[in-house]
Amino acid sequence: MDKNKLIGLILISILLIVYTHFFDNKLPKTSQQTTTQEVAHNTSNIQLQTSEATLNLQTGIFAKATQGVTKDIILENKDIRVTLSSHGAKVKEVILKQYKDYLGKPLKLLDEQSTNMGFQFTSNQASINTNTLFFNTDDTDQYIQQASIGKVTFMIPLGEPNQYLQQVYTLPSEGYALTQNWEFVGTENYIDQGKIDFVWHDFIKRAEKDVQACRNKTTINYYLANKTFKHLKEHTEQKEEQTIQTPIQWLAIKQRFFTAGIFTDQPFESGNILLKPTTQPDKFVKEAYTTVSLASNNLQPIQKGTFRFYFGPNTYKDLNSFAQGFSKNLPLGWPIVKWINLYLIIPIFSFIEKYVSNYGLVILILVIFIKLLLLPLSYKSYISMAEMKVLKPTLDALKAKYGNDMQSVQMEQVKLYREMGINPLSGCIPVLLQMPILLAMFNFFPNAIDLRQKAFLWAPDLSTYDAIINLPFQIPFYGSHVSLFTLLMTASTILYTWSSNQVNTPQGPMKTMSYLLPITFMFILNSFPAGLSFYYFVSNLFTFAQQALIKRFVNEDKIKAKLAKNKEKSANNKEGSFKKRFQDAIKASASHKGKK
């Protein structure tokens, strides 16, 4: 081997040794790390692709909207505070600023735990509810000043420029009406059969101390496009459900003092409503479930529409201004009674409360006003009572003369009334004419939100009963408490009945009934609002005072002289044919009875 070859072999050997020592351990490690990273990256990509594939399979073009960040935005005016959520572009919470709940806290008509609402449809056989989608918005909290309107826009882009979901909420500077303008643009090919529902579930929050009275007044009302008002039963502990096949203009979840409702510019095609008892009676009143179908055209969904929500008190002014027929959420009684409430009681009450802050005094002044209004009828009734008082000795003599022969007694009484020129019904007619006003009060006070949480004397709340004693047991038809205003009303009514009976002297069952009726009302009114019992009690007191005042201006001697003159005049005049036939009929009846 020559010298050069030897040197070459030595150099190659040195290079191999150096290469093995410095590079052999590093290269395999680097290769292994690179391979692991590539596998992990590829696995991650596979998982992401699988997740996206599943998401797309479930929600299609709505897939990306199922993930996002929730943003709450507040729209607030002087009456209401509405919290909107970008998660569903929905109403999350509603606070009525002018009212408190029974614990003295701000009254939450709705909140996230009690209510949920949104549009529902199927897309590629997958169920979609907008309250699960995340909308985009750049708007912030807004307090709406006078003569301005707050506005919040939520939108979901769906890929193409002409494909999006949009919901715009607006709130004026005052009032309880929230408007929602919604659009489904470019989605007609992605909604199965063109069917879109609006779903609203509400666990109706408790706001009153007397939860049972509130529960008895809570229901779902709805108003059809043909202007027909309907509702589910109120006084029931059972589940109430109804399927509606007629177009619906609005529906409302109505409580005793507050209502949450929705009105649509394009009537809903149909709907299903359900009301059932709650499983949490201390927290909620009832549970309401409503599903209504939006109008469609040849299996194509409508792309836009307007909803108006009402979240507010059951005051006639606010309800009536919201939508046609919406005032029916305030029950004021049968037609005649309702007209008296609308055009007499409510205007007078509203006028008085502008100047008087104590609602016990408001009721007192209301009684005085009504009594003055009815004074002509009361005067007529009292004159009739005075005439009967003058005739009482003669009537007693007739009863003593004929004993148990009631037919003869009645015949002689008719003859006496005719001779004296007295109409025995003249005292009853004024009383009957006053009955619609008494019935109007019976409907007005239980629904008067103005009395809610207003104290007077020992009653902490005139809108509910004034319990001076809570009993450890339940009395059937009476309750487990004692209402003092109801006792006072009952006592004053019995006293008035006794006073009236001293003049009219009813006999037999009529006398018993006259005393039994106040006792019956004591059982009925024991759980009614204290304001109603107080009104009836004060009304009785003023009736006594009114009669005493009228008595000072009525001369009984003049009444006696008038009756004597009428008797003399009747004796000189021939009997009219009708009166003669009437008397003959009574005589014939008496004769027939005698033959038997």
UniProtKB/Swiss-Prot annotation:
Gene: yidC
Job description of the protein: Required for the insertion and/or proper folding and/or complex formation of integral membrane proteins into the membrane. Involved in integration of membrane proteins that insert both dependently and independently of the Sec translocase complex, as well as at least some lipoproteins. Aids folding of multispanning membrane proteins.
Superkingdom of source: Bacteria
HAMAP family from the UniProt entry: YidC_type1
Regions that span the bilayer: 4-24, 332-352, 359-379, 425-445, 468-488, 518-538
Protein name: Membrane protein insertase YidC
Keywords associated with the record: Cell inner membrane, Cell membrane, Chaperone, Membrane, Protein transport, Transmembrane, Transmembrane helix, Transport
One annotated GO molecular function: membrane insertase activity
Source organism phylogeny: Bacteria, Pseudomonadati, Bacteroidota, Cytophagia, Cytophagales
Chain residue ranges for the region called Disordered: 565-596
InterPro entries membership: Membr_insert_YidC, Membr_insert_YidC_N, YidC/ALB3/OXA1/COX18, YidC/Oxa/ALB_C, YidC_ALB_C, YidC_periplasmic_sf
UniProt-listed NCBIfam families: PRK01318.2-3 (NF002356), yidC_nterm (TIGR03593), yidC_oxa1_cterm (TIGR03592)
One BP annotation, GO: protein insertion into membrane
Biological source species: Amoebophilus asiaticus (strain 5a2)
